[in-house]
A protein has these predicted regions:
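Periplasmic polypeptide-binding modules associated with outer-membrane biogenesis and secretion
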Residues: 21-34, 41-276, 285, 299-317, ...
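Extended hydrophobic-aromatic, low-complexity segments
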Residues: 191-192, 204-206, 239, 267-270, ...
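Bacterial N-terminal signal peptides that target proteins for export
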Residues: 1-8
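Gram-negative/organellar outer-membrane beta-barrel architecture
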Residues: 116-122, 219-410, 437, 474-478, ...
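Flexible, surface-exposed loop regions and adjacent strand-edge segments
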Residues: 113, 196-200, 276, 345-350, ...
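C-terminal structured "cap/appendage" subdomains that terminate the fold
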Residues: 523-527, 531-552, 559-563, 567-569
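N-terminal signal peptide c-region/cleavage motif recognized by signal peptidases
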Residues: 16-19
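C-terminal outer-membrane beta-barrel translocator/porin domains of Gram-negative envelope proteins
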Residues: 232, 373-381, 385-510, 518-522, ...
Length: 577
């Protein structure tokens, strides 16, 4: 019987505790701003069902409040508890009334730097961030300062750095705090020899990817840049370049050792897609990321749709002096087109020299050869061309596959002359731009502009691929793909020698990865600028931020066109830049 009675009492006490927990709410009064925020963070570990009015719980709350205030320089708060009766429909409230008291203020910050830190501007700049005398003590400032000293050491190669002393002293009777730090950075390490293991590419090509010289001071950004460059070549499946510390303790010269593994020699990709401009499309690509020890690579692509069938290749030859940023590109292909009033068979071959600059700009000079047999409207021709050109471009973006910020710019000039065997003289100038900006995360703006100009004395001999047509996605929505250009006497499209199109689009993030869009496109494709014929289309659309890039659906109609009235829809997948 006594055992039964004890069990009953224990059960009653447990039930009573749960009843209190379920009927008591904690409330802290007297704090605001950073003090309130920090105390709330300390109390956030307390679950609502743990709140009770007993002495043990009050002591727990008292400790948490004091810890939160102490971190911000308030060492002597006054804390009083009061249990408020429940309202008509509610729970009892355990109130903690807090008076922070007088804060502890900085009385001095004594920081001694030894070793290379005495003359290193990054360390000297850190000294300027110390709190001024009289500032309220903040433990985070002290801890952050010490962490910053360590971060500079790791970033710049002071691998023997240490704290001889680091104390935060508090004199409560004077309400003052004192920093006392004695820090020795030691000697700064330098880069040593860089070696590689597992590479199928000649060592001299890899050495010319190293962005620093042996003997340069160590910096983590240089090591990261080396890893990035090796990965960016596309030659390797994995890249790890790491310091060999055990070989450098005495000399302070840090050798690096890179372990790489070759990328698969052959990759084949196939896909089926759809776009409104060309309809269903089958694509295949064969990629050889490296073909020999000189790092040559090959990409072959095939694309088949109802209006266009194309087979092309691109052979890349990196230059020894700068394999990543300077290279030759040999390109060629076959293309057949049967679209609107265009029928064409084209064979092309081009040799280009590229410079990919660290600023992000890409420059190229090229020499192209092409043989085109085509019918455009009522005119049939066979044209052989040999023409040089120059191109400069840059693409920047932030925010992943659906950038929140970015721009793409491309400018090119091509020149053909019968003096070296071309069938026609011409000059072609083109400029293409896209800008993306986002405001307040939910408002996205996309602007596009395209300009083109052909100067020639025999336009009929210019192949359709060099002529300008407008209409369709990324041009003037509301019109069919490449349906805007001057027409001949029979009403067939001829293509234009002048092009100007622009687009403004606003997108709003409706929810999650879904965006709504509204847009207006305008422009013209003409051969005589004195006979301006601007076309305008406007519409609405939906964007879905898929894992492989934005997928879009647009509906658009022509504006103010007496000959075109129909609704056009556009489906597309791919980058906007």
């Amino acid at each position: 019987v006594p055992q039964i009675r004890l069990i009953g009492i224990a059960t009653l006490l447990l039930a009573s505790g749960h009843a209190f927990a379920a009927n008591v709410r904690l409330q802290v009064e007297g704090l605001s701003g950073a003090l309130q925020k920090n105390v709330r963070a300390q109390l956030s570990t307390i679950e609502s069902d743990e709140v009770t009015p007993d002495r043990r719980f009050r002591a727990r709350v008292d400790d948490a409040i004091r810890d939160g205030l102490k971190a911000l320089g308030y060492y002597e708060p006054t804390i009083e508890f009061d249990l408020r009766p429940p309202p008509a429909k509610g729970r009892q409230v355990l109130i903690a009334r807090v008076s922070p008291g007088e804060p502890v203020r900085i009385g001095g910050t004594d920081v001694i730097l030894r070793g290379g830190a005495r003359t290193d501007h990054d360390y000297l700049d850190l000294l300027k961030t110390r709190p001024a005398t009289g500032t309220v003590l903040n433990h985070h400032d002290y801890d952050s300062f010490k962490k910053s000293l360590t971060n500079v050491a790791l970033r710049k190669g002071y691998f023997d750095s240490k704290f001889n002393k680091s104390q935060l002293g508090v004199a409560l009777d004077r309400h003052q705090a004192f920093w006392d730090i004695d820090y020795d950075s030691g000697t700064r390490y330098r880069f040593g020899e860089v070696t590689f293991e597992g590479s199928q590419i000649r060592d001299e090509y890899l050495q010319n990817l190293v962005p620093f010289k042996e003997g340069d001071y160590y910096q983590t950004k240089d090591l990261a840049e080396l890893n990035r460059r090796l990965s960016a070549t596309g030659w390797f499946n994995s890249v790890i370049v790491a310091p060999e510390f055990e070989k450098s303790r005495k000399t302070k010269v840090l050798p690096l050792h890179g372990v790489v593994s070759p990328r698969t020699e052959n990759t084949i990709e196939t896909g089926v897609g759809y776009s409104t401009d060309v309809g269903p499309r089958v694509k295949a690509s064969w990629k050889k990321p490296w073909m020999n020890s000189y790092g040559h690579s090959l990409i072959t692509n095939a694309s088949i749709s109802a209006p266009e069938q194309q087979l092309d290749f691109s052979y890349k030859v990196p230059l020894l002096k700068n394999p990543l940023e300077q290279y030759y590109l040999v390109q060629g292909g076959l293309k057949r087109t049967d679209l609107n009033d265009t029928e064409a068979d084209s064979t092309t071959l081009a040799v280009s020299r590229y410079w990919d600059l660290s600023s992000g700009w890409q420059r190229a000079i090229n020499l192209r050869w092409s043989l085109d047999h085509f019918t455009q409207g009522n005119v049939t021709n066979t044209t052989m061309l040999l023409y040089p050109g120059v191109m400069i471009s840059r693409t920047r973006s932030r925010g992943g596959l659906m950038p929140t910020w970015g721009d793409s710019q491309r400018y090119s000039i091509d020149y053909s002359n019968t003096a070296w065997g071309s069938d026609v003289d011409f000059s072609v100038l083109q400029a293409q731009n896209v800008w993306i900006r986002t405001l307040a995360d939910r408002h996205r703006f996309v602007a596009r502009g395209n300009l083109g100009w052909i100067e020639t004395g025999d336009f009929d001999k210019v192949p359709p691929d060099l002529r300008f047509f407008a209409g369709g996605d990324r041009s003037i929505r509301g019109y069919k793909y490449k349906s805007i250009s001057p027409k001949d006497d029979d009403g067939k499209l001829k293509g234009a020698s002048k092009l100007a199109t622009g687009s403004l689009e606003y997108q709003y993030n409706v929810t999650g990865k879904w965006w709504g869009a509204t847009f207006i496109d305008s422009g013209e494709a003409v051969s005589d600028i004195r006979r301006s014929d601007f076309k305008t289309g406007a519409g609405v659309g939906v964007r879905w931020q898929s894992p492989v890039g934005p997928i879009k659906l647009d509906l658009a109609v022509p504006i103010g066109d007496k000959d075109e009235h129909g609704l056009q829809f556009y489906i597309g997948l791919g980058p906007e830049l």
